[in-house]
């Protein structure tokens, strides 16, 4: 089958890393990018140099209004560049972009993302949680995608992509009565470098490099949308910490069936080596956050950091590159839904 043709709206952290993931995986063909705030020569620079993930190990240039991205042994991507503020005006159809990654963080509802369909896109994948679009987590519920009816979908959040595979394995094997999640989360672009105003959430406006900032997250509750049996059983919060990338989930849960920590490790390792390979990983190494920069997995279970109080009450720890792991799942989701076309 021919590779799915992809457009990217918004060339920020996720937009650029989705393109990197697309080049690495060589499973989709990126044919168009839209960003009203970035000129084409600036796109070349931003794509080539990355403070977190390093310099792009390939070539990137521009010719007219096309980006040319290539890597040895991989397909070249010739990418039409648009600079439209209104998503309805982007000529996705003219570029042949059937699948659009909506990564501006602005058009996250069905109504708003629907504008891409007017420009000729066939499907829209929102790279953020959505209030009303169906959410899919690759490895957990992606097979529930309905090609006939699901035209605008969400890839959920990076944290939900970390938590859901872990929660699925634990719930399938031992049953989760209830659980609380904490994510210790790297800074993101929405935070302030120094103290500043921040709408209703005053703490969010404090300096990102100076503080551990308690914050809300819908990631745990969203697992209930992805795994209906867990609906109403999980909630959580976040601590934003002064690191540039890589976050870690702490899931504290009560189990229906008694299980030793070794029992839990065995089933997670079996899933990581089997049906969830490439999504859920397992480590017994003495790792820290920087060890997972540019890791392509959604969730890396840390066997050494996880603890048990008794056979019914456990704290499970799982790492994730909140930028790159997530961006790889966006590409995987597109690859999957394209097989249903």
UniProtKB/Swiss-Prot annotation:
Its EC number is 1.2.1.12. It catalyses: D-glyceraldehyde 3-phosphate + phosphate + NAD(+) = (2R)-3-phospho-glyceroyl phosphate + NADH + H(+). It comes from the Eukaryota. Its main location: cytoplasm. It is found in: Cytoplasm. GO terms for cellular component: cytosol. D-glyceraldehyde 3-phosphate binds at residues 157-159, 188, 217-218, 240. Pathway: Carbohydrate degradation; glycolysis; pyruvate from D-glyceraldehyde 3-phosphate: step 1/5. Keywords: Cytoplasm, Glycolysis, NAD, Oxidoreductase. Belongs to the glyceraldehyde-3-phosphate dehydrogenase family. This is Glyceraldehyde-3-phosphate dehydrogenase 3. It comes from Caenorhabditis elegans. The lineage of its organism: Eukaryota, Metazoa, Ecdysozoa, Nematoda, Chromadorea.
